[in-house]
Amino acid sequence: MSDKKYNVDEGEIAKFSRIADKWWDKSGEFKTLHDINPLRLDYIDGHADLCGKRVLDVGCGGGILAESMARRGAAFVKGIDMAEQSLETARLHAALNNVADIEYECIRVEDLAEAEPHSFDVVTCMEMMEHVPDPAAIVRACAKLVKPDGMVFFSTINKNPKSYLHLIVAAEYLLKFVPKGTHDWKKFIVPAELARMCRQAGLDVADTKGMTYHVLSQTYALCDSTDVNYMFACRPAF
């Protein structure tokens, strides 16, 4: 097994560990994730049909997406994260809400890919890659974990002045949607770069969607613009 510290930002782990008990507070630090989760879930289910599938959620945090995929009909959902405190929150919430066929493990995705290659119908890695030193390694591991006829989903944040204004200046400092320091603009990823990572990992990008926030209605919606938040739906190229 490789060095457990590789591709792990200890500062990011500590940051999310400090607020691990807030994951299921829909008006707290993770409100935005709760708000966009129905969009993410429908996008994934629309492309991959979760019913009866084995699913892996990489960087699952407190289990917001993982639990919703289990409720949508997945046969088995595994969530992995490097913040054990977040996983404890996820396990407790699933147990209290009688969500079956779901498990959580503190393990790097690269190590899981070595242990269980080509073992999941669906692999999701949402709002996670902008928090690690080497996102390309994450993409390669996800590609190794998915079955040849499966699908991999990524979501992250574009790197441009608009995303800086929306996600850092507005979301962190003006509107206070998320705590200050949640995002590091230097780690944002332009879609062309993520597409290159996917190709080099043996994945074809089948679809791309963006997400936009409507200020007046205070709701999120899918859109064709990838200027800020965006998602990829990918298939193995071989």
Swiss-Prot record:
> One of this protein's GO BP terms?
methylation
Judged by the first EC level, this protein's enzyme class is transferase
InterPro entries with a match to the protein in the record: SAM-dependent_MTases_sf, UbiG_MeTrfase
Q: Which SUPFAM superfamilies match?
A: S-adenosyl-L-methionine-dependent methyltransferases (SSF53335)
Any matching Pfam family: Methyltransf_23
* Sorted UniProt keywords: Methyltransferase, S-adenosyl-L-methionine, Transferase, Ubiquinone biosynthesis
Q: Which reaction does it catalyse?
A: a 3-demethylubiquinol + S-adenosyl-L-methionine = a ubiquinol + S-adenosyl-L-homocysteine + H(+); a 3-(all-trans-polyprenyl)benzene-1,2-diol + S-adenosyl-L-methionine = a 2-methoxy-6-(all-trans-polyprenyl)phenol + S-adenosyl-L-homocysteine + H(+)
According to its UniProt entry, the function of this protein is described as: O-methyltransferase that catalyzes the 2 O-methylation steps in the ubiquinone biosynthetic pathway.
Protein name (Swiss-Prot/TrEMBL): Ubiquinone biosynthesis O-methyltransferase
Q: Which organism is it from?
A: Neisseria meningitidis serogroup A / serotype 4A (strain DSM 15465 / Z2491)
